[in-house]
């Protein structure tokens, strides 16, 4: 399947589903709650298209509990790959939300997000477990 040919909303749904799957590799409870919250906000944006770009971005780049900080502290390669997938997915939905809002100036990390991120997102999930290829094909 060529993900880049999907409509924007369907690309976001695909990204969220990969993030949900990747989150199963991260067991720490306080982190799991934040990931679930980010996924819920992502789904909310897909269903409502409310102005949630900034809210989603704050899950990624937050001085106290940003996903990028948690990833930097991670030692386990599988967990780092899971974080890669989750961060990519939230960044993609954040970009879509910002664009829908008509925001002219995006945060620098979001500015570089485009459809090429799907290759990295998929590879990251497969690095968690090669059996995830089957899941990805079903999505």
Language-model-derived ranges and their functions:
Residues 2-139:
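Structured binding/interaction patches within domain cores
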């Amino acid at each position: 399947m060529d993900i880049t040919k999907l409509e924007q909303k369907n690309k976001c749904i695909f990204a969220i589903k990969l993030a949900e799957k990747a989150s199963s590799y991260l067991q720490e409870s306080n982190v799991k709650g934040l990931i679930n919250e980010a996924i819920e906000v992502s789904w909310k944006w897909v269903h409502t298209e409310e102005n949630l770009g900034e809210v989603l971005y704050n899950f990624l780049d937050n001085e106290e509990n940003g996903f990028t900080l948690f990833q930097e502290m991670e030692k386990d390669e599988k967990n780092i790959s899971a974080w890669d997938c989750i961060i990519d997915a939230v960044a993609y939905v954040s970009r879509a939300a910002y664009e829908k809002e008509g925001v002219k100036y995006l945060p620098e990390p979001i500015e570089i997000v485009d459809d090429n991120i799907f290759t990295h997102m998929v590879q990251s999930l497969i690095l968690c477990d090669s059996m995830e290829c089957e899941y990805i094909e079903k999505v």
